[in-house]
Amino acid sequence: MNQTCKVCGEPAAGFHFGAFTCEGCKSFFGRSYNNISTISECKNDGKCIIDKKNRTTCKACRLRKCYNVGMSKGGSRYGRRSNWFKIHCLLQEHEQAAAAAAGKAPGHATGSPMSSPGFGDLAAHLQQQQQQHQQQQQQQHQHQQQQQRHPHLPPLLGYTGYHLPEHFGARHPADAAAAAAALPFFSMMATPQSAFQLPPHLLFPGYHASAAAAAAADAAYRQEMYKHRQSVDSAASAESHSRYTPPTVATVPQQSQPQPAASPIDVCLGADDDVQSQHSHSHSHSQSQSPHTIHTPVAIRATPPQQLLPGLTTASHSSSASPTPSKSQSSSPLSFTAKMQSLSPVSVCSIGGETAAANAAASAAAAAQDGPMDLSMKTSRSSVHSFNDSDVCSLQDEHELAARRKYYQLEAECTTITNTTNSCSSSTSTSSSNSSTSSTEAAVAVKRQKLNPIGGESPPFGGFAVTHNASSAMRSIFVCV
């Protein structure tokens, strides 16, 4: 920067408080303006020379010179702006002042105040200018003239209705310096402030009316968008809940079928035995149901009477539509083959007369399936396959057969021990029979304890063996000798 300080003559650091000053004079003016009561009067009647060497000798004369060069507290109204911006604003002030002075007194000689011969003549000249300016303030057409001569000011300031005040012409730097020198020292603060004031939206950009309105509109928009998003989220959650929640199916109470006094054997199939191959009636109707329907176990009768066949068909349909499986019927993991073999140690032949029509329906249902499936290992109500060596080749069937053989062996031993006990108790005396009976009963109890875990492995068939006798169990099964 090729500028020098207007107060002391040192190289200027920038445009501060309305004038090019160094850092020292800038700091001095900032401190003295706020603490003007601590500055004493000049002892040399205000004739001290302020330069680079003796600028600190007299504070009163230094502050007076700061005012003379145009420094003011209002000069810092621009804030931390560039020097170009500050100088541009100052040049606009000079332009405005020159236009106002030329318009108010055409015939008046506006020579330089520094050409006046004495200090008193300068004061009188400044007073004359102030009086003329006060008269000029009463004219109503001054704002119109300023708007016509300087139409570029409103766009520069960014405020369409902003105009400079009327007493703008009195703030020419030379006139201000002369007026400050003519007044007493402590009356310098009574001088009018700078006329060049920025509009409120430039001084306080965060508090302008339009900015506040824009912020309010943005807040309202954000609130509306938040409400809209909440409504969309609630609708989406309701839709997903209705989509992924299975509908509740009312359980149809099954009407109990009248059972005859001497009912045949009821063999309960678990849900794991007939998930894919049901009996012919339930399999033909399961295609119209949803693929997620849980098939319940079906009570299958070995030799159902002819008059009860329609009733069994309806009962199996209603039970296959109910969604809740029966835990008591599906508790045994044994297959239908092992269950039927547990009833008799000999081979069981299929009943051809009862299964002729059901076999045709099962073959039609198997042909209607989507893909080929091997049904050789599947079981159904309609057909009871004859048992050969290939049906029990799996490891699971071998374990089940071994447990079943042990069960029959232990049961035979218990029967033999019981018979022996009865014969011994009838032939011997009372004392000896009591001792032998007690020992024999202890052995029977041990055998019964061994039988209980084996029978507990298959609760449905253990209970079946207890509740039914051998004659009713083998009523409808043909034994091949």
Swiss-Prot record:
Source organism of the structure: Drosophila virilis
Localization (cell): Nucleus
Protein name in UniProt: Zygotic gap protein knirps
Residues within the DNA-binding region(s): 2-78
Any one GO MF annotation of this record: zinc ion binding
Compositional bias ranges of the Low complexity kind: 100-111, 127-148, 245-264, 316-335, 420-440
The entry's keywords: Developmental protein, DNA-binding, Metal-binding, Nucleus, Receptor, Repressor, Transcription, Transcription regulation, Zinc, Zinc-finger
Ranges annotated as NR C4-type zinc finger: 5-25, 42-66
Pfam families with a match to the protein in the record: zf-C4 (PF00105)
Region (Disordered) residue spans: 100-161, 231-294, 308-336, 420-442
Protein family per UniProt: Belongs to the nuclear hormone receptor family. NR0 subfamily.
Primary subcellular site in the record, as a coarse category: nucleus
InterPro entries named among the record's database cross-references: Nuclear_hormone_rcpt_NR3, Znf_hrmn_rcpt, Znf_NHR/GATA
Function in brief: Transcriptional repressor. Binds to multiple sites in the eve stripe 3 enhancer element. Plays an essential role in the segmentation process both by refining the expression patterns of gap genes and by establishing pair-rules stripes of gene expression.
Cellular component, GO, one term: nucleus
